[in-house]
Amino acid sequence: MVPPAVLLPWVVLPLLGVQGGSGSKQEENLLVLTVATKQTEGFRRFRRSAQFFNYKIQVLGLDEEWKGGDDKKPAGGGQKVRLLKSALKQHADKEDLVILFIESYDVLFASGPTELLKKFKQAKSKVVFSAENYIYPDRKLEAKYPPVRDGKRFLGSGGFIGYAPNLKKLVEEWKGKDDDSDQLFYTKIFLDPEKRENINISLDHRSRIFQNLNGALDEVVLKFENARVRARNLLYDTLPVIIHGNGPTKLQLNYLGNYIPQIWTFETGCTVCDEGLRSLTGIKDEALPMILIGIFIEQPTPFLSQFFLRLRNLHYPKQRIQIFIHNHEEHHSMQVDSFVKEHSKEYLAMKVIGPDDEVENAEARNLGMDLCRKDPDCDYYFSLDAEVVLKNTETLRILIEQNKSVIAPLVSRHEKLWSNFWGALSPDGYYARSEDYVDIVQRRRVGLWNVPYISSVYMVKGKVLRSELDEGDLFHGGKLDADMAFCHNVRNQGVFMYLTNRHQFGHILSLENYQTTHLHNDLWQIFSNPEDWREKYIHENYTAALKGKLVEMPCPDVYWFPIFTDTACDELVEEMEHYGKWSTGDNTDSRIQGGYENVPTIDIHMNQIGFEREWYKFLLDYIAPITEKLYPGYYTKTQFELAFVVRYKPDEQPSLMPHHDASTFTINIALNRVGIDYEGGGCRFLRYNCSIRAPRKGWTLMHPGRLTHYHEGLPTTKGTRYIAVSFIDP
């Protein structure tokens, strides 16, 4: 028994702002028939575009088992002919009724019924099929096709329009099976001259009505004009009414569907971003959706301590969060263990797979996702790689409220175009740059974007993992990397992956050039990840000092301002002590040119720990700008021959004799706390009889070097005092 056709109630409801025309009697004689056995995301996109233009739609076969074959192969589709033949019985005698039969999963309307009917009647045929460049499924039939002087030669079965009686004639001879080829059936009718003339069939050779994308990707561009957007065929200079992402072109349809119909324009921005939201407003913490966060540390990663701090600071109740951690790197085991020990009880649950478990990337990602899939209480799975710097504490709530099956927040490398999504794929499935990629990354176009590839950070609905994505192994796929395999498998299930750049979320660390040979490797990241280096190591009040605030002058022409965080001070001291090769404090010093030091200290030079380039970058980026403000008219390139950390101890070297520095100006940064780590110490400028006896940790003194500022280091009486010194522009 053939199921009855299903008429969905939404199709007749008028929408505000629709572009479909006035609802004339002519348009009332238009009916759109489509086949959809399941309400996929592709179908819902088709439905929305039909709603927008106020088309009258009848859906055939809804909830019926699909037996029409694999849609990835050209053969099959006979089930659609059977359903159409059955539906046409009730319309056979309606001579004025025009019926459009169209696919739904990979189709968009770009214009309304008025334009469609006008172009159909201009064709002066009773039935018009879409046309394309390729013949299938039987290439031997090519010679039988009528020659075409201008346009596409071959019939495409994905869309056709005609009068009801003529369409009844078209399908009345169908007696095939559900998995027989509808394409071959219609092709043979068209190639029979008698039937073609009797039914009065023509092809839409110039894509005036139907734009099949297969074999025509280079022909189609977006046309923005007067707050509207259309697909334009450059080859024929036409504006098709219907866009069909047939064959391997579904990804291009996804791209076009980010704009058509009026989804996004330059004048309006995103018009659908607030549709179908899931509001979390007013929901008590204990009633919020449960999230499983999968954390993946797959390679040595800088700033991991900051990563865990940001994780803890996410604005979401920890008792509604479970955490799964896969740490592949022994280098990070101590940091992971510390986080688990200190914070595991704060969360609903926590599971860790470490280096000793020898679980590889793809398998670990499958395990994390499977924990959510198998837990009926898991509402969302949030995958988060350790190189993602997630600064927006509202990220989880934002993604949940957007209410998509799969959604990723945009993150990119600092001031780079490298990001966590691709706007297009090359023919072999790798990266290709879409026309809008740069605008999306730089947020010149803001909205929700259906994209073919996401990575690093994304959210998946738990119910989707238990339905469309219930396959337990999503992260393997031949020779593909785990992230590419995941996206490939998600796309194959017809699930859309969205990217949102409606908010600033954060960025991605560069893992290139990350060294693991030091005690505190993050210190060396000033080149690769300057923004994160600044956040960790530069004092929070440095910007105020740069504006002239928080700058003190305790002695004439001696400036005092914040520069380092406590972490920077501690790690620099610990790095020097870890290196351990302190100088002896003698005048003889092979480290300097000439081998003689007039005013020796017990110290370690920056170049001894391989930190000279990084220190120069620090001086150039942070000391030079403030120098030029404090000493107007002087412009420094922060050249230096000596940069070092000095250690003062009562039983070692407690003080330093009066001297001039071999510099134009000097910086002297206090690296620990007077009264806590040591007693005494400080600096006295003899010419001014002015002393600074309580240096503040992380603050620097800046003063002229040779000629005017003759000074001495005051005795350290207890503990150990550390300072970082640079003689600049010697």
UniProtKB/Swiss-Prot annotation:
Residue ranges of domain Fe2OG dioxygenase in the record: 639-730
Subcellular location: Rough endoplasmic reticulum membrane
GO molecular function annotation: iron ion binding; L-ascorbic acid binding; procollagen-lysine 5-dioxygenase activity
Example of a GO cellular component annotation carried by this entry: rough endoplasmic reticulum membrane
EC number: 1.14.11.4
Record keywords: Dioxygenase, Endoplasmic reticulum, Glycoprotein, Iron, Membrane, Metal-binding, Oxidoreductase, Signal, Vitamin C
InterPro entries per the UniProt record, alphabetical: Collagen_mod_GT25 (IPR050757), IPNS-like_FE2OG_OXY (IPR044861), Nucleotide-diphossugar_trans (IPR029044), Oxoglu/Fe-dep_dioxygenase_dom (IPR005123), Pro_4_hyd_alph (IPR006620), Procol_lys_dOase (IPR001006)
Membrane topology: Peripheral membrane protein
Signal peptide (residue range): 1-20
Pfam families: 2OG-FeII_Oxy, GT_PLOD, OGFOD2-like
Entry annotated with the keyword Membrane: yes
Binding site for Fe cation: H659, D661, H711
UniProt cofactor(s): Fe(2+); L-ascorbate
Record field: catalytic activity: L-lysyl-[collagen] + 2-oxoglutarate + O2 = (5R)-5-hydroxy-L-lysyl-[collagen] + succinate + CO2
Biological processes, Gene Ontology terms: collagen fibril organization; peptidyl-lysine hydroxylation
CDD domains, alphabetized: GT_LH1
Lineage top rank: taxon: Eukaryota
Cited SUPFAM superfamilies: Nucleotide-diphospho-sugar transferases
Keyword Glycoprotein: yes
Active site (record annotation): R721
Annotated glycan sites: N200, N403, N541, N689
Subunit structure: Homodimer.
Protein function: Forms hydroxylysine residues in -Xaa-Lys-Gly- sequences in collagens. These hydroxylysines serve as sites of attachment for carbohydrate units and are essential for the stability of the intermolecular collagen cross-links.
Name of this protein: Procollagen-lysine,2-oxoglutarate 5-dioxygenase 1
Annotated organism of origin: Gallus gallus
Taxonomic lineage: Eukaryota, Metazoa, Chordata, Craniata, Vertebrata
